[in-house]
Amino acid sequence: MEARPQQPLEDRALLAEVARSLVANPVHVRVEEEQRGKTLVLNLYVLPQDRGSVIGKKGQTIHAIRKLFSAIGFKDGREVIVELATD
C-alpha cells in the first residue's frame, strides 16, 4: 500500500493538535519531522513545565500518543515514532 504524499504533514499537524489540547501553553508546541528510510520520526517540543502533561501519570499519555501514531503508520505500511524532544 502506497502512502499518500501529504501524510507526513497530516501526521505532524495531528500530533501538534493533540499536544496543544494537553498543555497549558499551546502556542509553544512545535513538531518537527525527520525521515529515516521508511520511518517517520516526529519530534514533539513543548515547554519544560508542560512535559509532565504530555508524559502523563506513569507515562500513560505519551504511551497512548505513540501507540496512536504507530497504528496510523502501520495502516499506511510505514513506521511512525513520536519522540518528546528537548531544545
Where are these regions (language model features)?
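Glycine-centered tight-turn and secondary-structure capping sites
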Residues: I55-G59
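RNA-contacting regions in translation and RNA-metabolism proteins
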Residues: M1-S53, H63-D87
